Amino acid sequence: MKYLIFDFDGVLGDTNASRIEVIQNMEGKSREEAILSGDQYFTKSTHTRDLNVSEESLSVMKDWTTKFGNLLHQNGFNLFDDFIKELKKIKDVKMAVVSSGSIIYIKPKLEKCGLEFSHMLTFEDHHSKEEKVEQICKDWNIPVKNAYFFTDTISDVKELGSIMDKNRIYGCAWGYQGAERLSEVLDENHILYTFSDIHKISWILK
């Protein structure tokens, strides 16, 4: 059995253009400012487990995420349908999604994509991706280091590299930060340049 956990935005969901528009509207930023602030956030997450976020700050983050989620859902976006098609070819697999985004825009898309995800854990469930990955692996009854993770951001690689097997963390070049930025934390054998590259992975089945 293969155990695959996916980030959503930029990996399964083609949300970048819509996200930039929403950030511009929510925060009054120019397109360039929205892109720059996004790259900074995707390089160093502001809500990892070790940051000890206060309840007050967490409440503000949740309110922001809800507003963002509603606007992104209204604005609309597509999935990376060709990647979804490649994932459907993988046999003997369990899949899950963890995201710092909102269930508001993620769940409606994934429910219709034809893939089965045992979990869709978002910011509403916990602010830390470490916590969410650990919960999924606990429910799957496997060690965390047995799961694979697919992301498009440096911050995810840094955050989850402390608890997961780094050899099972892969970057998706079609996502937010692209191959050049991902190459700062991943070697080329751990970057998927095309959707079909996922079939080049030599799965470790334990």
Where are these regions (language model features)?
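Conserved Lys-Pro-Asp/Glu-containing loop-to-beta segment of HAD-superfamily phosphomonoesterases
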Residues: 130-160
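Structural recognition of alpha->loop->beta junctions
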Residues: 114-123, 182-205
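A short, structured active-site edge motif that brings together acidic residues
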Residues: 35-39, 115-129
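Short, acidic loop-to-helix structural element flanking the phosphoryl-transfer center
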Residues: 70-103, 107, 111, 130-131
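Acidic, Mg2+-coordinating phosphoryl-transfer loop and its flanking beta/alpha structural elements
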Residues: 150-195
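Short amphipathic alpha-helix with an adjacent loop that forms part of the alpha/beta core around
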Residues: 134-139, 200-206
